[in-house]
Amino acid sequence: NAISYEIMLKDEGRPAAGRRDGYFSIYRQGGTTTDEGERIDYRVKMYNPETGGQIDVRNNENMVWNSINLKRVRPVVLPGIRYAVMCVPTPLTLAVDKFSVMDKQAGYYMGKLSVIFTPSLPTIN
């Protein structure tokens, strides 16, 4: 079991002038800019296993959780692993603030949200 967990969520990292601090973005396919008219900004909330409440996640910022392996742990079967792995459920909620569709270019919007999870492991002397 890990002593602590470092978690970071980030989007593609493209520049996004006018985007609220901490928000994430998806972009219009075939778009030539990252202007507000060719992207849709969103925010992410995450279940905090330390408190049991929801927290706002900020784009590209590390969060460190300690001793969560002592709370709400349950076995989960993951693809490619023959045995159940002990996990703490941490659902994500993605939310888009209201906007006028007239302010956006027509087309398909897509993006990538990466979740980087780094457990620290105890050392054996």
Residue ranges of model-derived segments:
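Extended, well-structured beta-strand/loop surface patches
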Residues: 36-105, 120-125
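N-terminal small/polar-rich segments of proteins
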Residues: 1-45, 95-96, 100-108, 112, ...
